[in-house]
Every structure is written in C-alpha cells, then in structure tokens.
C-alpha cells in the first residue's frame, strides 16, 4: 500500500471493505461445494426485480426496504456477468484489432435511469450488461456490425439503433444493438438477460468521454442532457464538427457546415472556458501491488475520487468474478466514490476505453484543436488565393 493510501482515511475505508468482503467470500467458498459456480445466477422473479427497482429509485423508501431491494438488484445485475463475458469474448474473436471492453452498469446510473423513465422496468433494462467495441473508422463500425449480425449465434436479436446516421440531439453518436442471451449449456441464464453492444469510432468515444468528465466537474449529468444549456450546446456543436470529419450527418438543430459550427463552438468555449477546464483536470493513479497486468483475463474495479484527484484500481481474475461483483456492490453502498466494475484484455485497453477514470482528455482536446487549426489554415489559404486573383486582375 502506498503512503498516500495510508494517510488517506477514505482509501482506508475502501481497503477495509475489500478485505472484509474477501474474507466473507473465502469463508463461503470453504463452506460450499467444490463445484460451486464462479458466476452469479438469478435468484428472484420478474415481479420482485421490478419492485426492487421502484423501491431503490424512490427517495421516500425506508432504509430496510431499500437494503432488501439492493440485494435483489445486485443479484440481478451480477447475474449478467456470465452472458456479458460470453458475448464480449465472441466480439473480441471477431474483431481482433478493435478495443473491446465490458462493464456492469453502475448503481447510480441504474437508479438515475429509472427516475428519468418511471415506466421502465428493471427486469427489462437493456444495458445492465454492456459491451463496447471501439474501432478507427466508420467503415469498420459497420463492418463489425455486419459480421456480428451474420455470425452463427443463438442469442435473440431484440433491437438496434444507428445513432451515427441518426445522431441524438445531445450529440451522442454510436451504433447500438441489444440481444437477449441464450445458452444451451447454461439454461439458468435464459431468463431475459439483455446485453447491449455499442459500436463506435475512437472519435465518437473521445467525445463521449469529454462529456462525462465535464459532467463530473459541473456535478451534472450532461450525458443525460441535464445541466447548463450552453455547455450542452458546446458538446452538441463539437459532435457535429466530428461528424463532418467522418463524413456523416450532423446533429439535429445544429449548422451543417464548418464555417458556422466552429465560430459558435469558439464563442461558447470562450464564455465557459470548457477546454481550459478539461485540460486542467488531473488525477494521480494508485495502481497498488494487487494488479497483475500480465494476466489477460481480469476484472478491474476503478474507484475515482474526483475531489481529491485520486483513482484506485483493483484487479480480480475471472475465476473470482463473483468476489469482484460483491466488492463492487459493497463499495457502492458504503462509499460516495465513483466506482465501476469492468473487464478488458490489457491495461492499455482499459485506460483507453475508460479515460474518464484516468482523467485523460488529451485526445479530445488535441483532435478538436487540430480540426480548428486546419480550418483556420484553409481560410487563410483561401483568402490569400483570393487576394492573388484580385491583384492579378487589377
């Protein structure tokens, strides 16, 4: 443990949680049969799961009701780990050059979604388990989508949304597919386990990351279109600028051409200093001695304390995924830190796919500034050519 961690009581709390949960889990493993499943299985009915979602999203719920509901929700969420692992492993095989990562949805995101959409049922929430495929180009996005659709899988296709050709008003761009998991070998998971797959380019990914980081700074859920309207507008405008770079449609209610988009973006940035804020965000990373970067089958707990500028990382082998989900559940209940449980094939992949937990916005800023510089150089060149023509004809 680093000296920083020893001196920081908040980090001590995290370590105590991990130590206590690990002891309980190891004891339960001793008491159970040798062939105990390493993957969590669903234990509750559809009605119990939906009721739990409503209780947790209701601020008037009693502590006892909420605690009982959390047990149900955590089991339902953790049960998605196995279907998610199967689908993401398949995606990695089909897309060896892509960055493929997976995550179980954060409790705060689950409750926030139910609060925003009161009619939503937790049992039918389509992104409790999410897999993200990140590639270089638009063509590679559609090729990855095509390959997965044509593959011989037994999972049941439920829906798709092309937010690249039809961007959201917020500026969000990605290609989504939802499948209902099916297995001949693990029938216990054939129980409406929905997995969402997101296909996106690196440019779309760095935009989404910047939105999330600015949301943390402003303490508003910008990615759900909540917060300062002008800051939201800035990111929508930037998304349209990026869309033009990828030769794709711009976002609704934004100009269609760079000569209109860039001046508006610069005006909003000048007013709110958004790029300066993003550039200034930094954290120090405590990797801890518990990480093993040589192991390619790891689950990572990313624990971000933005106020103190610290991020902790804990790793778990796939054989201990049940322990990882239990630690995840307990940290969410006992700490105010921003925490997520994810899986990636390497640390570099992890860092690129979740840069918001490492506060690395450099790709977003560098790309945007490069586009602006290129646009301004083109304007200067056009003006120079025009002056030369006028001089020649005078």
Descriptions of predicted regions:
Residues 65-116, 310-311:
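Surface-exposed, low-hydrophobicity interaction/linker segments
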Residues 335-383:
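Short, mixed-charge low-complexity intrinsically disordered segments
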Residues 310-319, 339-342:
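A short, exposed loop/beta-hairpin motif centered on an aromatic-Gly-Thr core
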Residues 4-69, 73-79, 190-300, 304:
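An acidic, glycine-/histidine-flanked metal-binding catalytic module
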Residues 115-126, 302-303, 329-331:
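Short, flexible, solvent-exposed loop/turn segments with mixed acidic/basic and small polar residues
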Residues 148, 154-186:
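Short Gly/Thr-rich strand-loop-strand
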Residues 136-140:
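Helix N-cap motif at beta-to-alpha junctions
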Residues 320-333:
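A short, charged, amphipathic alpha-helix used as a generic interaction element across diverse proteins
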